């Protein structure tokens, strides 16, 4: 499981012209792109959620937990693209929808259980993601 996290001033996800999830904090928030691979499970989702919630990448080395920063979760199977051969990426390392969708949901629920305000995109939908990256700060988390 991989989570590409970006520190943002704001972020929003739109599907079919409708905003389905947005974080517009007074300070900073996080945008978390979540990719799932074969062999991932609920325990990994929970541990990554905990890692993200306490990760000190906000102002003054604070975490989302410290500041109550909101988190926008967006499923992103392309985090497991394999570009070693040829010019067309392979998606074989990405878990199928039946595996990935409940694990992305479990990741978001684990964040909520920790106390996070979580917004989310729509799994499998074609989404437009708008963000204002702060820093920029972009970090890859992986278990």
From Swiss-Prot:
One of its GO terms (biological process) is D-amino acid catabolic process. The keyword Hydrolase applies. It is found in: Cytoplasm. Its main location: cytoplasm. Belongs to the DTD family. An aminoacyl-tRNA editing enzyme that deacylates mischarged D-aminoacyl-tRNAs. Also deacylates mischarged glycyl-tRNA(Ala), protecting cells against glycine mischarging by AlaRS. Acts via tRNA-based rather than protein-based catalysis; rejects L-amino acids rather than detecting D-amino acids in the active site. By recycling D-aminoacyl-tRNA to D-amino acids and free tRNA molecules, this enzyme counteracts the toxicity associated with the formation of D-aminoacyl-tRNA entities in vivo and helps enforce protein L-homochirality. This is D-aminoacyl-tRNA deacylase. It comes from Mycobacterium marinum (strain ATCC BAA-535 / M).
